[in-house]
Design a protein with these regions (language model features):
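Chalcogenol-based redox active-site neighborhoods
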Residues: 1-193
Length: 193
């Protein structure tokens, strides 16, 4: 579901060469921590867009389930007002490919997933550069909501590195010093901090 409309063949290739992508997985529609995260991404969407970054959410629910949740008011636990794409990974292929699929499952001789329990996604987040390369990833367990400001900081860190060729030390944020990625650079940085 993208912008309130069903899209049958959504692909991250649409953003290749043009945008960074924050691809995040969440466990289930109509649950508890999940709507807080989806609304938090929506609240910061303009900041992501200002950084040439698309936000895409994924769960193992169906597109009909996404649609119903998008029609549900925030006051009733819904995500009405969320405008970025929500991908329905009901066949679990995307969640499995990004290694965030949770549950008891295997793969049969034909390459099909077989499940002996409910399969849902962990709270994975992947920052993908304009060339389609994953540059940052983090996976939270089901009860642990993520920090959307940290996702923005990672976009800033990646663009800083790409623009300046300097790496971002621990606790770096925009406006702080980076460092040259060599022994002299780290020595210089540490002597000043």
């Amino acid at each position: 579901v993208n912008g309130g409309e069903f899209v049958s063949h959504f692909s991250l290739d649409h953003y290749a060469g043009e945008k960074y992508v924050v691809l995040f997985f969440y466990p289930k529609d109509f649950t508890f921590v999940c709507p807080t995260e989806l609304h938090a991404f929506q609240e910061k969407l303009a900041e992501f867009e200002a950084r040439d970054t698309a936000v895409v959410g994924v769960s193992t629910d169906t597109e009909q389930c996404h649609w119903a949740w998008l029609q549900t008011p925030k006051s009733q636990g819904g995500i009405q007002g969320v405008t970025y794409p929500l991908v329905a990974d009901s066949n679990k292929v995307i969640s499995s490919a990004y290694d965030v699929l949770n549950g008891e499952f295997g793969v049969d001789e034909d390459g099909n997933l077989t499940a002996s329990s409910e399969m849902i996604a962990y709270r994975g987040l992947f920052l993908i550069d304009k060339s389609g390369v994953v540059r940052h990833q983090v996976v939270n367990d089901l009860p642990l909501g993520r920090n959307v400001d940290e996702a923005l900081r990672m976009v800033d860190a990646l663009t800083f590195f790409e623009q300046h060729g300097e790496v971002c030390p621990a606790n770096w944020s925009p406006g702080k010093d980076g460092m040259k990625p060599n022994h002299a650079g780290v020595a210089d940085y540490l002597s000043k901090h």
